[in-house]
């Protein structure tokens, strides 16, 4: 159903004729009010590797008001393999600065900025300038710290990463309200449902109604520290995606080594991953069999196709949260590139 609303050019939060033409497709898809909310939103993306570039591209094209790309690291020789915003010959430059020109060219109406400081050194006041914060390439401690800051200040929080064939996203939207478009169902008179086809009630796809809903999210710390000792948790263990436990292993590797597994040190890193898997699973009180040894073959480096999928999902969730349109993923999304499928998992306090 296309909402028949006029794009006002003056005050009252309207958008200009130029913006209405630029975002005509989005307005037809999710409505003028949702687009207005996007045009009033500022987003921070931390980590401008392959996944960060995909998220930035999608949000800039969607038409947020402003987007800040924060990264204190330099471009490595491997980065251009998945990071398409970086131009040739940029090795050694700051990753965010090297991404600015192509990012801004995607949509001149969006205010794209860069920040070259380390996110760990940013004060709480820095994050309050944004409506949504999305972390990539960050340590577990930084993820938890920034999530707590966002939670205190009612800022939409997202995080995600890509490890080889695997990727994940997580959202903490606090107490989130949204509207969902539902198709109206015509009332059926008693006995009519068994009558001739012509007399049966039909679903009119052009007749819809907007339903307001509310959902509550938990902090990332609680989602990562599930107690698997309870009977209810044990029953859910077999149904939980193995990628949740893979994430625990990879975040521990990142904390211990200060980097992600690399193909240059495959043998050493593979052995360390197996050891970390055993240690993490032992601390959780669960069997290592939940994550077979061959997982080490599929979690090295960023793969461009996986970045595209996970970045598309993560950007879509940010758009949904900012526009308050459609149900969000609560709270994890895991993508397995070997299977070519993804799953949404709600993990946290039982």
From Swiss-Prot:
Keywords tagged on the record: Acetylation, Ligase, Nucleus, Phosphoprotein, Ubl conjugation pathway
Coiled coil start-end: none
Modification sites for N6-acetyllysine: 202
Keyword tRNA-binding among record annotations: no
GO cellular component: nucleoplasm; SUMO activating enzyme complex
Domain of life per record: Eukaryota
Involved pathway(s): Protein modification; protein sumoylation
Post-translational modification N-acetylmethionine, affected residues: 1
Organism in which the protein naturally occurs: Mus musculus (Mouse)
Broad class of the protein's primary localization: nucleus
Gene: Sae1
Chaperone as UniProt keyword: no
Modified-residue entries (N-acetylvaline), positions: 2
Official protein name in the record: SUMO-activating enzyme subunit 1
InterPro entries (alphabetical): ThiF/MoeB/HesA, ThiF_NAD_FAD-bd, Ubiquitin-activating_enz, UBQ/SUMO-activ_enz_E1-like
PANTHER family: SUMO-ACTIVATING ENZYME SUBUNIT 1, UBIQUITIN-ACTIVATING ENZYME E1
């Amino acid at each position: 159903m296309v909402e028949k609303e006029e794009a006002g050019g003056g005050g009252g939060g309207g958008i200009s004729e130029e913006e209405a033409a630029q975002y005509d497709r989005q307005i037809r898809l999710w409505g003028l009010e949702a687009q207005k909310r996007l045009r009033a939103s500022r987003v921070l993306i931390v980590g401008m590797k392959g996944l960060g570039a995909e998220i930035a591209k999608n949000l800039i094209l969607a038409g947020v008001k402003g987007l800040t790309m924060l990264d204190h690291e330099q471009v490595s020789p491997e980065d251009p393999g998945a990071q398409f915003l970086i131009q040739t010959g940029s090795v050694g430059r700051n990753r965010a600065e090297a991404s600015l020109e192509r990012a801004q060219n995607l949509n001149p109406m969006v205010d794209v900025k860069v920040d070259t400081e380390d996110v760990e050194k940013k004060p709480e006041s820095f994050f309050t300038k944004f409506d949504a914060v999305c972390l990539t390439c960050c340590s577990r401690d930084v993820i938890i710290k920034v999530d707590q800051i966002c939670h205190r200040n009612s800022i939409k929080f997202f995080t995600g990463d890509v490890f080889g064939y695997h990727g994940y996203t997580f959202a903490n939207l606090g107490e989130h309200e949204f509207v969902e478009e539902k198709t109206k169902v015509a009332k059926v008179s008693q006995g009519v449902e068994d009558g001739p086809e012509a007399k049966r009630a039909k679903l009119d796809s052009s007749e819809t109604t907007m339903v307001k809903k509310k959902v509550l999210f938990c902090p990332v710390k609680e989602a990562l520290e599930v107690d698997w000792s309870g009977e209810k948790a044990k029953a859910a263990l077999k149904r939980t995606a193995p990628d949740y436990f893979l994430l625990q292993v990879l975040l521990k590797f990142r904390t211990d080594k200060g980097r992600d597994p690399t193909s240059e040190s495959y043998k050493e890193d593979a052995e360390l991953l197996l050891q970390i898997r055993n240690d993490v699973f032992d601390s959780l009180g669960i069997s290592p069999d939940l994550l077979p040894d061959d997982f080490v073959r599929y979690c090295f480096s960023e793969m461009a196709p996986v970045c595209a999928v996970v970045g598309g999902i993560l950007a879509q969730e940010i758009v949904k949260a900012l526009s308050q349109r459609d149900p969000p993923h609560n709270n994890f999304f895991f993508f397995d590139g070997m299977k070519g499928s993804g799953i949404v998992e709600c993990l946290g306090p039982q």
